[in-house]
Amino acid sequence: KEMKKLNKNIYVKLLRVSGVYFEGNANNEMITRIVGKSFENQEDLDKYNEFLIDAKERDHRKIGQELDLFCFSDYVGPGLPLYTPRGTIVKDELQKEIERVCRKYGFQKVSCPSLADISLFETSGHAMKFNDELFRVNSPKGHEFVLKPVQCPHHTQIYASKLRSYKDLPIRYMESDKQYRAELQGAVGGLSRVYAITVEDGHSFCTREQVKQEVINMCNLIKDFYSNMGLWNDHWVSLSVRDYEHPEKYIGSKEDWDICEQMLKEVSDELGLNAKRCEGEAALYGPKLDFMFKDALGRDIQIPTVQLDFAMPK
């Protein structure tokens, strides 16, 4: 019933029909969204149907419930997972291993509050670029705060809290803490897209001359950890660069971007990462190396990232 033969070469699989607000704005009219996939032959369609059955059995939400690892509550809200005692053990053990590897590569653990004054994110540029993704909190006296969507602005303030000498560099901080993003409700699901997620974040403050070695250090850290997890040989790397036709989307000078992109290319070549150049995939403040790993169904999932940022320190 879900497959209709349009002609001798095209087959369609209807996946779902749902209502959605136009442009994601609840004040707009609700329209119907139809999601499907087309195939050139019956064999490809049959393979896809088998994939869907396999995906349903391997769905982490189903496995998480069966193994009693996490749950959700309508009272708590969607996109806000609750880890059970068993799930918390798994989560804590992973966190301990990540912190152990980070210390091995010279990172010092820090701890920052979940809230920050809105001015911090106005200065960093996040308030302008990600305005719709910020959870804003007003104090009884009307003072505006933000639940942190990233950790980097906080870490810059630890670095800036006292005078530093170039002899102290590089200085490496790491933190394991919650980050908050106001995702579109229709996009929230399971543990893959949530409002609050624990992120292991590391930042290295260094001179320009030290940047390349710091990137290499972080890439080796990633290889170390994911090798321990048995995942390293099933991945590929994206050299995520800017969209050259829309420079207004990014912070920083063209010269700095050119330097950063070339440096990441050199690191990829030297470490044998064979990074694939992906235009338009950079963050607003710099290019990056995105490490893509395969899940149990062969889908690419971005997990760790090495990000260069010349803009925020300024």
Please place each PLM-identified region on the residue numbering.
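Conserved alpha/beta enzyme-core scaffolds, especially Rossmann-like or related mixed alpha/beta domains
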Residues: 64-88, 193-254, 279
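Hydrophobic alpha-helical membrane-association signature
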Residues: 94, 214-218, 260
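A translation/RNA-centric and nucleic-acid-associated enzymatic feature enriched
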Residues: 137, 143-144, 153-162, 171, ...
